[in-house]
Amino acid sequence: MDVLWLTLADPEPRHNGQFVYSGGLIDAVAAAGAKVKVLALERPESPRRNGAGGENISWQLAEHDPRSRLASLASPLPHLAHRSFTRSMRRNLAELLESQTWHSIVFDGISVGWALRPVQRWFLGARDRPKLVYISHNHEESLRAAVASNQTSGVKRWGIQIDAAKVARLERSLVDAVDLVTAITPEDGDLYRARRPDKPIDVLTPGYCGRRLDRRSITAAMPRRAVVVGSFDWIAKRMNLEEFVNAADPIFATAGAELQVVGSGEESFFDRLRKGATATEFTGRVKSVSPYLDRARIAVVPERSGGGFKLKVLEYVFNRMPILALAGSVSGVPLHDRDGILLYRDHEELAKGILTVMDDVALLNHMQERAYELCRDEFSWSRRGQHLLSTIAAL
């Protein structure tokens, strides 16, 4: 099967959930036997260049051409898709559509939603067009609406609401046009089915290929520390983190506990949070999160906005970190409150819950062992690739 795979950018290095998911699926589909041609933007931090190839994968990388959020205001495209709506990407897409016969064209995320119209125009009137697949990373319409409603600044909320309306229009167009939609969680799948019950919707949770610890023992000798790992470049991630730090930091400081935030984000954002924090450390981007997980007792998922599948949850599970989270923030994994995870209603309850169990090392070890047991055999990338290919072939 010859697959034209359209995605935002070269996924290397895979330092956030979007790149982990895209890169994992591309590798898995190629390993399952498809010949995959990937069209994406170059990334300066990646060693890969245009024309690079591997077994069953070849890369057509358009010039790196950053586009500002302000530039998208005048476009009918949302900022997510406007980023890759470059002259080089459009030219490369036209060349690839003309170059050969494709069995399937994959729209990997709403970021390449702009490509729908040129693809439709190219195959207008064709009796045998490729199967079109939309790989969703979130149910974007509901997610962006939630992010806008949680924004406290009136001006920012107005801007986010306008962009959210653009997202909704583009996502609906993609869902209506393609032959198959994949959802990253069962909950997202239900949202797509509610509007289009006639559309083939398949749940395609991520796989995991990172570090797995055979065993780990949390002891009283370890720092009384909880850790939040993530990429904090997106506004929803920053909102979640700021709300949690504001609630947790004074409680942790009083209890003599530590909160460590590990991951990338604008330094000005971290500097602002540092000014009001006593018990919280912000590391910025690190080469590996493993040493930070090894020195913490608890992993935290404090996300009120953001939707979708949290790939860091798998990293926590397979590194044997007991997880405490906001209710509703952990989807797509076989963990349930008091069975491999502890869930709380709001940030204050979450912070207090962390301190309640911080010194109960027997409970913490039971939690990490149970979560590992529940997830051990559930997140294979190879099975994801085989499943996606067989689903496309059956359309």
Language-model segments: what does each one mean?
Residues 341-348, 356-361:
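Conserved acidic donor-binding segment of nucleotide-sugar-dependent glycosyltransferases
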Residues 67-79, 133-166, 328:
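Acceptor-binding helix/loop patch of EC 2.4 sugar-transfer enzymes
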Residues 17, 359-392:
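A charged, aromatic-enriched C-terminal amphipathic alpha-helix characteristic of glycosyltransferases
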Residues 141, 160-213:
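Donor nucleotide-sugar binding/catalytic pocket of nucleotide-sugar-dependent glycosyltransferases
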Residues 1-55, 98-100:
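N-terminal subdomain of nucleotide-sugar transferases
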Residues 203-278, 282-294:
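Conserved catalytic-core segment of nucleotide-activated headgroup transferases in glycan assembly
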